[in-house]
């Protein structure tokens, strides 16, 4: 059973909160992101080498900024976590925004502390449309947790927080502006499929070529039909096609990397 938390106003002491954000060339997104969390007790930014105005914009909101070469999604978020000074952590990405409703719930949580971690739905926008189907919503993410109870244990390029203890659900959404153009989407998915393929190879996963087209077709069918992506109109079709292509490249690239590795090992 999912436990739902309701917010109420109360003027009582609360624990302090550190917001952690990792960045790379996010000048288009970062200001709105920071505005949505400027009420926090501390904002931590770990940048992996931005060449645009990301750092300059961040300095308007916090001086807790570090530069660290990109080690992977989960490791970079661990770096940010280690810099946080307060007992509660809220991790968000540069293209995400804390809604006013979510803010109220978070402040209530910092007063009651009736769990060790909290998940909430993510309201994803794809090409400027709120995607309500195709697996895009409610897309619960666990981003608020006690520092001493949470750790990152995901497989790049996707982060995952594991909390030791009780986890509850907040109904208010985190707003996520994913991609504003198809060019941006294709570029990002190419990078994601590279990282996913490399992770599969590191894990020693065996990729059977005959299964790749089946996985690709299933991803489209699952996204567009099973999860009713068609209800989001042409946006839903584009998203389902994109998901299937990303699945194809993820496994095809993994197969290619494994093939090259085995070929190198068999050279005289």
Which role does the model predict for each range below?
Residues 29-31, 52-61, 101-102:
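Acidic helix N-cap motif at the loop->helix transition within catalytic regions
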Residues 35-41:
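Short, acidic, metal-binding catalytic loop of nucleotide-sugar glycosyltransferases
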Residues 44:
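Conserved beta-strand positions in the Rossmann-like core of class I SAM-dependent methyltransferases
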Residues 55-83:
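Conserved donor nucleotide-binding strand/loop of the catalytic core
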Residues 36, 47-56, 93:
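A conserved acidic beta->alpha catalytic loop
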Residues 1-35:
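N-proximal low-complexity "stem/linker" segments adjacent to membrane-targeting elements
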Residues 78-82, 87-92, 99-261, 267-268:
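Catalytic-site signature of metal-activated, phosphate-bearing donor transferases
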Residues 41, 62-63, 85, 114:
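Residue-level detector of structured alpha->beta connecting loops
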């Amino acid at each position: 059973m999912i436990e739902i938390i309701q917010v109420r106003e109360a003027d009582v002491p609360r624990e302090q909160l550190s917001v952690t954000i990792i960045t790379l060339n996010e000048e288009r997104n970062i200001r709105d992101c920071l505005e949505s969390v400027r009420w926090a007790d501390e904002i931590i930014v770990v940048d992996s080498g931005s060449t645009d105005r990301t750092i300059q914009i961040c300095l308007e909101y916090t001086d807790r900024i570090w530069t660290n070469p990109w080690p992977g999604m989960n490791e970079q978020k661990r770096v940010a976590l280690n810099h946080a000074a307060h007992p509660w952590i809220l991790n968000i990405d540069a293209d995400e925004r804390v809604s006013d409703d979510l803010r109220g719930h978070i402040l209530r949580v910092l007063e009651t502390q009736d769990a060790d971690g909290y998940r909430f739905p993510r309201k994803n926008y794809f090409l400027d449309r709120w995607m309500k189907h195709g697996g895009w919503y409610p897309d619960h993410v666990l981003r608020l947790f006690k520092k001493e109870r949470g750790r990152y244990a995901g497989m790049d390029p996707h982060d995952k927080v594991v909390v030791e203890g009780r986890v509850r659900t907040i109904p208010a959404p985190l707003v996520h502006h994913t991609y504003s153009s198809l060019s941006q989407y294709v570029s990002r998915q190419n990078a994601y499929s590279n990282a996913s393929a490399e992770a599969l190879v590191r894990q020693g996963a065996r990729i059977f070529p005959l299964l790749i087209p089946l996985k690709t077709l299933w991803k489209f069918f699952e996204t567009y039909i099973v999860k009713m992506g068609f209800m989001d109109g042409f946006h839903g079709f584009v998203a389902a096609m994109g998901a299937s292509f990303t699945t194809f490249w993820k496994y095809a690239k993994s197969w290619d990397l494994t093939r090259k590795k085995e070929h190198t090992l068999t050279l005289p």
